[in-house]
């Protein structure tokens, strides 16, 4: 799990280092309000790095939604620190009571092409910019 956390941390660093004008609006205030698209992009990245496919999980707590990756019991989240009650920038864990509070459900495989060609074009451009980030 240490290698998975390193990969997730690396991807987060790449997002942070990417010029904002190269990112869609949904990622320009990362991690705030970025969990949906960041989760799809991270799922794509981890699959390409050989970690297999993850599911996109979506949950609600107190009127706020949150998305993260999950494969079996393994949770991967690079945007949880957008919430005031969570400080860790990267979560890779077999269990997370914090995520349990969202009562998330698996929606679909986390890839940049799950929402059709238009979304794939936008997320694909962002993905290329992120991978080419100077950070």
PLM features: residue spans?
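A structural boundary/capping signal
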Residues: 1-135
């Amino acid at each position: 799990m240490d290698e998975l956390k390193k990969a997730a941390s690396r991807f987060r660093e790449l997002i942070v280092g990417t010029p904002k004008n190269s990112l869609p609006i949904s990622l320009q205030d990362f991690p705030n309000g970025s969990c949906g698209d960041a989760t799809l992009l991270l799922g794509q990245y981890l699959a390409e790095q050989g970690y297999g496919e993850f599911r996109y999980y979506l949950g609600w707590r107190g009127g706020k939604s949150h998305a993260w990756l999950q494969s079996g019991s393994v949770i991967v989240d690079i945007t949880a620190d957008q919430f005031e009650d969570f400080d860790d920038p990267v979560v890779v864990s077999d269990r997370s009571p914090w995520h349990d509070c969202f009562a998330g459900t698996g929606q679909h495989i986390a890839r940049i092409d799950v929402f059709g060609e238009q979304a794939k074009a936008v997320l694909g451009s962002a993905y290329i910019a992120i991978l080419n980030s100077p950070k």
